[in-house]
Amino acid sequence: MRRQTAEVRTGIVEAAYESFWRLGFRRSSVDSIAARAGLTKRTVYAYFRSKDDLLAAVLQRYEALAAQRLEHIGNRMPDDRIGLIESFFDQLSGWASTTPRWSGSGFTRLVVELADLPGHPARAIARRAKAKTESWLAERLTAARVPNARERSREIMLLTEGAMALTLIHGGRNYIDAAARVAKQLVRQR
């Protein structure tokens, strides 16, 4: 019974993840999530008190996936500062160009969608995930002996977020390439 319960919960979270990613939080209904999971709406509410609770579970799962992705990327990055930046933005470009219906960072999209709810718990999860990414990048920059690595990391995060947003708007990889060029200039500075 316990295993079945965990499988049902995981199925709901996966169905919600797909729906939130494709449609956004507000456009996703619990009815459609239940149907996608092959369950009833009542069953979904037996596992999650509200759509907001389900969103929190989805974001925790997405945060874990993002951490795994960063670990995978980090293992493949060169140690030199220029190679590191090239690899980082190549990974971003690859993600944007090979993911069907790519729509940028789910965390960023969610925060934009919930902009009128500054205290929403989902925004805290998104903030924590972005802070982890920034710290991860700062660690890589420090290892590559980039001066002021924390500051450079923040600047590169700004470039990355802007590149993702503009790539989503315009398509193509031009904005990611431009962000990579600027990031290389930043890490060349002494």
Where would I find each of the regions flagged by the language model?
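Hydrophobic alpha-helical connector segments
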Residues: 57, 71-102, 153-156
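Amphipathic alpha-helical segments used for helix-helix packing
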Residues: 84, 98-121
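An amphipathic alpha-helix signature
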Residues: 13, 67, 86, 131-134, ...
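Hydrophobic/aromatic-rich alpha-helical bundle segments in the mid-to-C-terminal region
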Residues: 119-131, 142-190
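Short hydrophobic clusters on alpha-helical segments that form packing/core surfaces
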Residues: 12, 16-20, 92, 137, ...
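N-terminal intrinsically disordered/low-complexity leader segments
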Residues: 1-7
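Short, basic, alpha-helical segments at the C-terminal edge of helix-turn-helix-like DNA-binding modules
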Residues: 60-66
